[in-house]
Structures are given as structure tokens and as C-alpha cells.
């Protein structure tokens, strides 16, 4: 069984963290329906052992960071807050690239201000190339150099990447030390298998998003059947599979519900047998 912790930057974090995206309003735009509930979810997450929170100032925009500050400031020493830059929101709630030096610098300062911090623990460069929905090839040298300069200025402790290809990871590692990569990955969507193993070899965290994303009905049925046999939810099984997939995988499931938060956190105690793992591994081939 893999360890329940992994080093992210210079801190050891619990591998089951929390993603704050769903704390904003519908479509990750505007304020939440109930700010008090959002604050309660964050405080309960820490009470359940979460010490790794994933956020961004373009969630809302500004909303999730402001709620995190209201709920948790002053922050405990063992809490790692990871944020992202490289995108912005249009007035119509669209997601737009924000890769110019001025936009990247503004994003870092917006995150600092709204989180109430003098330095950011980890900043992921969110890459939006091609259609912006999945990784696409293209140089990220210019953008990463801007982020590395802000690291040298003391505004950012550690640098990560999001929505990137293996070629971009290699390019980035020539410019700065990379502590994490955040891409889409789950039982059904396993394009990053080789990347995960390579990053694990080098002690770099891999943070998958959309743990139930991109499933066909057949794949969902298989997962549901496995979950039912274990007395668990499909999400719990999907999260448990990820935890057992590789020791460098850190999870950031998001929710705006305390009940769902508790369900997600219970996945840490769910051990999947070799037989169950084999069945789940077959999902990506269906």
C-alpha cells in the first residue's frame, strides 16, 4: 500500500487534498449560492486532514481565493495552497488564455492579494494551446521564464505545470525546478501513464483532475458495479484507484457539499484488491 503522504515542494502533504473550484458559482463564475456553506466545507476539509488545497484567482474570478482567506486565514504552517495562472475569465464566463508577461505578473499579484499572502507556496502555469481543452504542443519557455523570474523575486516558492505534454514538461525542467504536473487522468483516460511513472521516478507530484471525467456509459457501468460490490460510491472507487496507481499521485477532488466531502475523504481507507484493480484497469480498454 502506498504512503498516505508525498512531498510537494518542501512540505509533506496528505495525498488526498481538496480542489476549491466548485466553491464558486455555477460554471465556476460568480459567488457561491451559499457562502456560509462554502466556508464550512473548507473548515471541515482541514478538520478531516486536508493540508493541500488547489485553487486559482480565475475561479470566480477571485471568489474561491477570497473564500479560502475568509475561512482559513491565518493559515496553519502545514497547509500548502496551490494556485494557477495562465488563464482569465471573459465577461461571458468564457475561459481565455492569459500568457503575456503583464497578465502573468498580474495573476500572481491577484492571487497574493486575495489569499492574503506575501509568497505563494506553489504556482502552476496553466497552458492553453490548441483548443485550450487538452494538452497541445507549443513552446512554454517565454511564459515559464516570467514565472521563474517571479520565483527569484521571492513571490513564488515553487513552480508546477497544468495541461501540458511530456515535451513541455521537459522544456520547463530546463528553466526551473518543477514540483508538480496537473493534467486530466482517470481510470478511463490514461494518456499520461508513462508521464506519471517518469515523474514518480524523479520525485515529482502528479495531480489528476476530472477523476470521473470522460467515461462512456459502459465504463461507468463497470465502475458502478465494482463500487456496489464494495459498498462504496463510484467516486470513492475512482479516487482509491488513483491513490493505488502511483505514490506520487495527489488528489484534489472538489465539492461544495460537506456530505460529499466526507464521502471523498473516506476513499483513503478503501483498499482495492488485485482482482478489483485488474477489473478497473480493463475500463480504459472498453
Curated annotation (Swiss-Prot):
Keyword entries, A-Z: NAD, NADP, Oxidoreductase
InterPro entries for this protein: Aldo-Keto_reductase, NADP_OxRdtase_dom, NADP_OxRdtase_dom_sf
GO molecular function: aldo-keto reductase (NADPH) activity; pyridoxine:NADP 4-dehydrogenase activity
Known function: Catalyzes the NAD(P)H-dependent reduction of pyridoxal to pyridoxine in vitro. Is not able to reduce 4-pyridoxate, and to oxidize pyridoxine or pyridoxamine. Has Kemp eliminase activity towards the non-physiological substrate 5-nitrobenzisoxazole, producing 4-nitro-2-cyanophenol; this activity is not considered to be physiologically relevant.
Entry annotated with the keyword Secreted: no
Xref: Gene3D superfamilies: NADP-dependent oxidoreductase domain
EC main group: oxidoreductase
One Pfam family this sequence matches: Aldo_ket_red
Matching PANTHER family: AFLATOXIN B1 ALDEHYDE REDUCTASE, ALDO-KETO REDUCTASE YAKC [NADP(+)]
TM segment ranges: none
Gene Ontology CC entries for this record: cytoplasm; cytosol
Keyword NADP: yes
Designated gene of the protein: pdxI
Binding residue positions for NADP(+): 210-218
Superkingdom per UniProt: Bacteria
Record EC number: 1.1.1.65
CDD domains named in the record: AKR_AKR13B1 (cd19088)
Name the record gives this protein: Pyridoxine 4-dehydrogenase
Catalyzed reactions per annotation: pyridoxine + NADP(+) = pyridoxal + NADPH + H(+); pyridoxine + NAD(+) = pyridoxal + NADH + H(+)
Family designation: Belongs to the aldo/keto reductase family. Aldo/keto reductase 2 subfamily.
GO BP of this protein: pyridoxal 5'-phosphate salvage
Active site as annotated: 59 (proton donor)
Amino acid at each position: 500500500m502506498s504512503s498516505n503522504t508525498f512531498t510537494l515542494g518542501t512540505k509533506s502533504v496528505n495525498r488526498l487534498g481538496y480542489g476549491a473550484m466548485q466553491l464558486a458559482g455555477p460554471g465556476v463564475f460568480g459567488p457561491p449560492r451559499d457562502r456560509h456553506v462554502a466556508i464550512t466545507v473548507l473548515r471541515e476539509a482541514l478538520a478531516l486532514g486536508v493540508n493541500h488545497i488547489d485553487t486559482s484567482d480565475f475561479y470566480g474570478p477571485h471568489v474561491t481565493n477570497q473564500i479560502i482567506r475568509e475561512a482559513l486565514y491565518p493559515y496553519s504552517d502545514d497547509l500548502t495552497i496551490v494556485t494557477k495562472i495562465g488563464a482569465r475569465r471573459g465577461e461571458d464566463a468564457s475561459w481565455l488564455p492569459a500568457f503575456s508577461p503583464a497578465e502573468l505578473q498580474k495573476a500572481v499579484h491577484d492571487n497574493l492579494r486575495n489569499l492574503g499572502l506575501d509568497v505563494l507556496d506553489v504556482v502552476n502555469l496553466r497552458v492553453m494551446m490548441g483548443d485550450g481543452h487538452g494538452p497541445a504542443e507549443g513552446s512554454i519557455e517565454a511564459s515559464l521564464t516570467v514565472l521563474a523570474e517571479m520565483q527569484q523575486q521571492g513571490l513564488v516558492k515553487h513552480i508546477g505545470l497544468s495541461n501540458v505534454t511530456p515535451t513541455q514538461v521537459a522544456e520547463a525542467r530546463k528553466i526551473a525546478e518543477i514540483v508538480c504536473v496537473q493534467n486530466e487522468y482517470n481510470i478511463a483516460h490514461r494518456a499520461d501513464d508513462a508521464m506519471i511513472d517518469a515523474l514518480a521516478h524523479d520525485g515529482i507530484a502528479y495531480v489528476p483532475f476530472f477523476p470521473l471525467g470522460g467515461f462512456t456509459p459502459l465504463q461507468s457501468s463497470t465502475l458502478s458495479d465494482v463500487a456496489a460490490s464494495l459498498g462504496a460510491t463510484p467516486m470513492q472507487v475512482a479516487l482509491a484507484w488513483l491513490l493505488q496507481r502511483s505514490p506520487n499521485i495527489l488528489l484534489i477532488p472538489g465539492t461544495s457539499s460537506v456530505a460529499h466531502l466526507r464521502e471523498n475523504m473516506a476513499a483513503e481507507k478503501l483498499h482495492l484488491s488485485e482482482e478489483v484493480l485488474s477489473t478497473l484497469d480493463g475500463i480504459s480498454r472498453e
